[in-house]
Amino acid sequence: MRRPPPLGPTTASGPEGNVRNLQKRQAPGPGAAGGCGPEAGGCRENKQKRRMVARATPGRGEVESDKSVAASGAGKAARRQVEGRRGPVSPSDSSDPRGLEAAKEAELPLQTERHTKEKRKVTEASSDDPQPGLDLVRKESLTSSESFQTVECLQSLGKESIIEGIKRRIRNKKLKSLENPPLKITENEATQNIKVEFQDELYKNTPKYSCNILSPEVENNSVLKLRDCNCFPHSKGCNDENNLPYKPDGGCMHVAENFSKKENLRSLAEKSDTNSIPQLLQTEENVMGVNKLLPEESDLYQSKTNGLLSCLQHEKNKYSIEESSVGRKPRKRMKLSEKADETVTEMNFSNEYNKSELMLQENQMIADGKEAETKSPLNVLRKVSHNTVSLMDHLLSVPETVEKETSSEHHVNAVFQKTIEPLLKEETENASEPLGYESMASKEDFKSMKSFIGKSPNEYHIERRSSREDLRSASEELKLSCQRTIPMTGKRTWPYYSCARISAWCWKKASLPESSYFLRGSQESCRQVDVPKHQTNQTHLTDSKLLLQSSLTETNTESSSKEKLDSNSNCLSSVSAVEPTLMVIKEPIIKDDKKIKSEELSRRGSEVISNTTEDTQLTSETQSLTGNKKKARGNLTKLNLTATSKDGQEANNSAGKTIHRKACIAQQTFIVPDLVKILNTGRLTNFKIPLLKNKSEKRKEVNAKSSEREAYSPLELLDNLSGADVRQNRSKENVSMMMLGPQTLSIRNSVTPVQASSDSFYNKKSYSISPSFTKQGNNSKPSNHVSEPGNIVSNKEVASLTVENNAFSCDPGYVEKSPSFCCNEQETFRPVSSEVRGRKITKNFSEVGFPDILKAYEDDVLLIDVIQDDPDLFGVSNEGELSFTSEVPKISQEPNVAGEHQSTDSKYMETPVKKEPSDDLRELPVLDCGWIKPDICASNSAESEIKRDPKDVNTSLGEVANETSENETLGDFSEQIKGSDLDEKHRFTDKVITKEEKENIYEVCKSKDSRNADFMVGECQFAVPVPKPLCLLVPPLNLSGRQEDTILNTWMNDFRFLGKHSVLKLQNPETCEIFKREKNVGVFQKSLGLMIPYKYCKFHFNTLRGCERPLCKFAHVPEQGDEKVCMDVFKKYININELCLLQRAVNIFMEYYRKFPPGVYFDLQVLNDLLNSLLKHCLLKEVFQIVNLSIMVKMLPSLKILLNIFEYVATMKLRNAVPALIDIFCKLVEAGMVLDPEHFNYIVKLLYQVQASKQEITAVLEMKSRLQMRRFKKNWKCDLDSALNKLEHCKEKGDWTKLGKLYINVKMGCEKFADFQTFCACIAETLTKNYEDERPDIPFCEFAETVSKDPQNSKVDKGVLGRIGISAMYFYHKLLQWSKGRKVLEKLYELKIHFTSLKGLIGPEKLASRCQIVNVAAEIFLKSGSLDGAIWVMRESEWIINTPLWPCDRLDVLNRHNLLCTIAHEILAKSLYRQTFEVLQNLPGFQNSQETVEVSQYSLLFNKLLGSCIESSSLGMSSSVAEFMISKSIPIDFSFLRRLITSLGRSRLWLKARAHYKSALSLGCYPPLEGNLYRKLLLIPSYLSEIEMLLAIEIFMVSNASSIQSPGTSTQILQIVLKRCEDNQSRSNDDYQAAVERLIMAARISDPKLFVKHMTVNVNKEQVYSLEHCSALKWLKENMKWAGKVWLFSNH
């Protein structure tokens, strides 16, 4: 986290060098990112500082205690070092405020002396303290918060070599002041000198933090009071026990450190007057930043105090610019680094002094501005310091007690605001001369003046002792100063747990210096440090100033928010006094800012905007410091946006500025991680915050309540500047908050200021959120959290600001490495920012104390409520926009960040109004510049956009603003842009997104580009120094060449690590799927107003973007029967006329009509309109698809559509489309489309224009000739009335052939099938009605013959003829004209028309069942004597009677039964047994169970058939009939069955005989076989035939097979008894004797033969026979296999 000592004066030996070294030594700690950046030789410098302090300060223990009070974390390290040098000093966190209270209780003279001493001590201690931020804060709260802030600022700036140079100067001055502990006058002079020097350095290093910088003494007392008032207010809102538990590291970057600072400030506040509490409330926002930059806060506070005093002095001594030169002298000693510091101080001061005006001047006179501005700001600071004494005396009446001083400081703040306004104006005018840096320096000087004014006279004297160093430190602290201050009470008192707590009060400038390492403050510091480096490298302070200004501007833009955060942290110790002053300063600045804003927008862009906007917003509301701070903050944000963009352009010209931007970007990235975490923590966007609706009013109210509401100030400023600016300011505030969290993580000290700044930005938007959010802002994580939901757009801007600031924060080391610290800074910056941008904060973040941020977030849980997706507060796409802001700022880096802030602000303003897919910009915002660029150019990848440059980011910001409120944002933002050079590029942004529909497309691109952009930004955004991104189709915001260069460098120096994504993964389109796919789909997509059934996907049908679910459970294609839904969807899509919707309509049309035919809801006009819309969008391929499908479904488009297609192809010279078009044309003509000759001629002409081939033209001509041949005259072809008249004419003449031709013509010419059906019905009626019986001809037959001869005859024609034939058949059946009816049926048979499945066209036959139609036809044949015809009709109908598919009435069934029976009798009479059996088999009741008919009634028919078959010896037919009867349980005559069995046996058909015998046996035809079978006894009736007797003997043998085949059974006898018939005893003798012969015959016909022996006659005179054993055994051996199966097993 540390940097090597800066080259040149930065590392110069001496008190300042020692101080720097001391600060460097203090920097190392848990929060290495803390107040001081890494510097080579940090230990040596620390030792030197120690020696310096030992030499300079007699009482270091006291100073040490003060320092410990000022910053717990940094103070611990500092105390350890000081204790090593001075002796053990007990750490004092909450106890430190006691010392402050004691100091307050002391009389003013004593306080003055004590302040002088403490200031000396603090100066020495600060040089000694390795962690000036923490120790100084503690000591400052106890002894001299000013010196602490100075040291703290130096610590935060310690990463910059310039800061240490400043510290050394401050030490020298403080040593001098210690040596000269005179009264207020001496102190004031020394303070002024120290302030001048310190501010010069601080302004150089931390232009935005300079406001917080106060001389140690001045800050000591007044800081206690002011902290109580300004810092404590923030601490009230933000300070909790968590505030004190800051990390011992000097890098107040950790939230804990911030908390500790806040707590220290609170303790100071508690010790100080209760009046300080309101000030504390006002400074709560600053306190957030102070919490983050608490160590820096003291320095920043000193800078503020110095700046305030300088402002007051300048106000009183406006004409005494000479003192400013005094401040410059130390700068000169500082060499380039000091010069850079001075430049930074000047920049800060000028920023404070002239925000907008300085911006304009910055572009013109950077070098001159540096010197002149430095002089003027320093002079002003000194004057203000002197004036501050008087003003302080005036306002405070030089209260004896510190509390009195505190209250007076409050008054001073108020008065100073009033006084500073003119001063700021004057200074602004003066600063306008120096252009860039002067404006910033003047602004920072004003901040310092504010802080000086806020300080007590004692502090003022102390400040005079170290006026120059103090001024520098004051400038830095002023920059680092937070609007929210944490008292040194040891508790975090955030009276208002609102996001707004951190709002505008966070001094962007003030917070930036200290947090410049890792936060916006870090960015500032980096800028300042970079500026000295650049100065060293470039030799020109002007160049460094330009770089610083651009960087600062960018940093001020993001830094402003960061500074607010930083200033909040600084306010912990110093803002108490500084903030009231800052408030005063900011009000005049607001006025000036609004004026200057336009100038600065054009000139300084981000630089002045950040400072001016901050001050302006803060100053906007003079009634309440918080409100003023908020306003100033909002204004600063706006101005910073503009200035930042412009500065970004200028920065492009200078590497240093680029580095600063990068640092800012890195810081922004840091902020973004917290915000991302917050965003990730719980879709904060879901929480709605009504604050934004009445943005200006609520903002004012919130500002009055807390600094966070300062965001509303931008709304007020919106009227003056532009809605876009205001939105940008808000976005900046949100961004600042976002940046705050991550920055705090990244850098403890610098991050803390940055957090304060971010809190400031956050507070600006926190108005939308809540005080708790502001509180969270100090915690860094809470503010990020708040920024995410509520301030998405703003957060994006904030992110950009953060990025810029982070660039500085990370860049310090890099800047030290090289003036064009693009690569080094990028490396240094990248560690901090790599995670920051994605959601991962780099090691710096972890070091920064991310857990503290988490803790702060936990403390500020209310942020969740604030982050709700309130369109008024955050815009519809707050999430995406937040991501965008964080990402984009990173990309755009400082200048772009400013532009982005503006865009984001305006976008934010508008975003609340817009809740459409365009809100998906949220996703793109995630992508950084890449995201923005997608807005600008959807086709361009985010990666390319990222490569483009911060310009692209600016453009994207502009786009964002445009998207958010295209009109409002574009107008306002354009105005700002016009005021600055940004206008043109922002216009491009405006152009990029002009419509919500385009936003939709933009979202699509955004999702794609955003991924690329995010990836690029995360991995390569700043890693690769690329020129302006080529992807930027539209020119980016007009940035000065320097800014543009810087932007490019910033991209090159991206704080992120290559290959890593920024913390804001929510911004990644895929990550945003959480919000977009699931959430945005329902929340962000606007309904098209269609009434879609529940089963269909509402997103697919009813939204512009459609369904984005990978697997959707709802249908995307209408189902059969929902054709009306299709038509409604098509109509809606056609009305909207969006490309994506039309393509979706094509898909739906194709998928639906491929499956289902057109129905009653099909509207041909909708088809034509859809084709027209597709043609207008040049979707020729889709047109062809739909036309081809419409031809398939027989729904042809209109002729006009066809001609339009030809015209389009000819106009566009689409030669390749001609073959497909000709093919479609031929299909349409063949399908029935009618074209006139002139149409063909026109088509041929168009084909010649498109240079169609001769073959293609010939094809068209051939279709023309074919069409002419097929059609009749045009007057009647398609005219139904004419055709009907023709039909009547044919009827009258009986010219049925002509009627057939008329039918053919109508069929070819009629376009509507309904008309054709009507015409056919008329034909059927004509052929059936009013027909004379005398005429022998059959009209239907002649008509059908003519139609059938048509070569175009098709199935349709056959169907029509069949239906007309049925009508004719019914007609003749009704008239009992069987012969004519038979002729009709024969004609149908001849034409192979299956009429049985058709229905008639008219009359009852139109509703007749199929059974009825068949019955009528069969009856006609039967009546006409054609049995074959009747059977043909039955067979044609498949004998169907009643089926589910063809239901019929019972009457139809009865008619069928009678008809079939009649046919059977007639056929049987003709001995057609097979046909008869077929007819009988199809009687009702045999086909299905639905025919509830008793089949037993058919017994007579079947027995008659069976008998006839047996008599005719049709054994096969007889057997089939018998089997059917047995199977259907139809009663069978046993005599026929026995006869059948005998006949079959005698015919040697044994198989069938045995089967029927067995069936007959089961039916009871034969007496049952008793158990005698097993007793070797067989009883055979005498009436059986020989066949039946043989079958009985076979059963007997098979049944006794086991005993017959056993070896020992040969002696057994098988007896056969021939039973007599009792009924015929009279004839029994003859019949019985015949039976005996049949028995013997049966034995003989057996195979093998059986032998039967007569044994005896029984009592009944029945012959008894025995079956020879050997023959039976032989028969079984040969036949047992089949016999066993036949006789032993049942067939069923």
UniProtKB/Swiss-Prot annotation:
Gene Ontology CC: cytosol
Signal peptide: none
Ranges annotated as biased composition (Polar residues): 608-627
Function as written in the Swiss-Prot or TrEMBL entry: Important for normal spermatogenesis and male fertility. Specifically required for progression to the post-meiotic stages of spermatocyte development. Seems to be necessary for normal expression levels of a number of testis-expressed gene transcripts, although its role in this process is unclear.
Coiled coil start-end: none
Record protein name field: Protein TOPAZ1
Cellular compartments annotated: Cytoplasm, Cytosol
Keyword Magnesium: no
UniProt cross-references to Pfam families, sorted A to Z: Asp_Glu_race_2 (PF14669)
GO biological process, one term: lncRNA transcription
Biased composition (Gly residues): 31-40
Region named Disordered: 1-135, 600-629, 894-919
Feature: compositional bias, Basic and acidic residues: 95-116, 902-919
Stored InterPro entries: TOPAZ1, TOPAZ1_dom
Main location: cytoplasm
Domain of life: Eukaryota
